[in-house]
Every structure is written in C-alpha cells, then in structure tokens.
C-alpha cells in the first residue's frame, strides 16, 4: 500500500493509521459514547487484535440468514454483514469498552471513525499476513 500514488490527504491518513497500528492504539476522531445522560464519556483509544478461527466461524454464522425459496429454506450469507461481524470481533477495546463491540455500538460511530476503523483493520490484517509470509518457508539450520 505504501507504493500507491495517494493524494496528500489520503497519504496523511494512511501514514497516521500505520503509525497508530505500530504503536498498538488507534485513535478515533469523534469517539464512541459510553454511558448515559450526564455520565456519558467519549472513548477514543481502539486496541485491535488478530482474529481467531473461532471468530471467523462466529462471524460467518452471524452473517447467515435463513430465507425461503421455491425449493424450500436456504441459508444465504451476506458479505457485508460478514465484514461487519469480523470488524466488531477484531476490536479488543475502545477505551473502557471491551470488545467485541455490539452492532448497536458500531452504529454509534461517526462515518469518519467507521471508515478509519475499517481501513485500520484492513491494514492490520495486511501487516499480519505480510509477517506470516516472511516467516513462511524459513527453516532453521540444523547441524549435521
């Protein structure tokens, strides 16, 4: 992604997200409200985590919906719902809010924060995949 020709604003966003991922905490611009009434506090610091096989299975199950067709009941999977389910499970915490976030909390994010979080998780996944690729195929030297 570093090699793409991005406009100045996109490059700045990319660079800030990369730096924040490397530091371990992503900052939301607008924040996520926690609490009710006068006790509501905005939460800004997002900690991400790697998805597990269990997370993937749970996200897939949550993305499926039973619909009736001419031939009878059919399970249909929604790719957009799958993406949201994976996103919410990848969030370890937002401030004092422990993950995975509920869909109700995801809906409370501003558009800017939602897009920032989506980009960050995508970049985080790419970084994890790249590190796995670098490790792959390396064999420790064994004395003979």
From Swiss-Prot:
Record carries keyword Nucleotide-binding: no
Location of this chain's protein in the cell: Host cytoplasm
GO cellular component: host cell cytoplasm
BP-aspect Gene Ontology terms: viral tail assembly; viral translational frameshifting
Pfam families named among the record's database cross-references: Gp41_Mu
Induction: Expressed in the late phase of the viral replicative cycle. Expression of late genes is activated by the viral late transcription activator C.
Primary residence: host cell
InterPro entries noted in UniProt: Tail_Gp41-like (IPR056974)
Domain of life of the source: Viruses
Keyword Cytoplasm belongs to the record: no
Keyword terms, alphabetized: Host cytoplasm, Late protein, Viral release from host cell, Viral tail assembly
Cystine crosslinks: none
Function: Required for tail assembly. Together with FS-gp41, may act as a chaperone mediating the interaction between the tape measure protein (TMP) and the tail tube protein (TTP) thereby directing the polymerization of TTP to form a tail of the correct length (Potential).
Family of this protein: Belongs to the mulikevirus tail assembly protein family.
Protein name (database record): Probable tail assembly protein gp41
């Amino acid at each position: 992604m570093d090699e793409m020709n991005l406009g100045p604003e996109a490059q700045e966003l990319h660079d800030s997200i990369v730096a924040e991922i490397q530091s371990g905490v992503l900052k939301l611009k607008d924040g996520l409200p926690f609490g009710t009434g006068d006790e509501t506090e905005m939460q800004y610091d997002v900690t991400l985590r790697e998805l597990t096989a269990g997370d993937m299975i749970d996200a897939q199950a949550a993305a499926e919906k039973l619909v009736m067709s001419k031939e009878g009941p059919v399970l249909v999977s929604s790719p957009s719902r799958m993406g949201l389910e994976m996103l919410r499970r990848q969030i370890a915490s937002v401030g004092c809010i422990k993950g995975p976030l509920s869909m109700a909390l995801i809906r409370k994010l501003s558009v800017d924060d939602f897009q920032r979080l989506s980009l960050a998780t995508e970049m985080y996944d790419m970084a994890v995949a790249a590190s796995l690729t670098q490790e792959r195929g390396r064999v420790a030297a064994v004395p003979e």
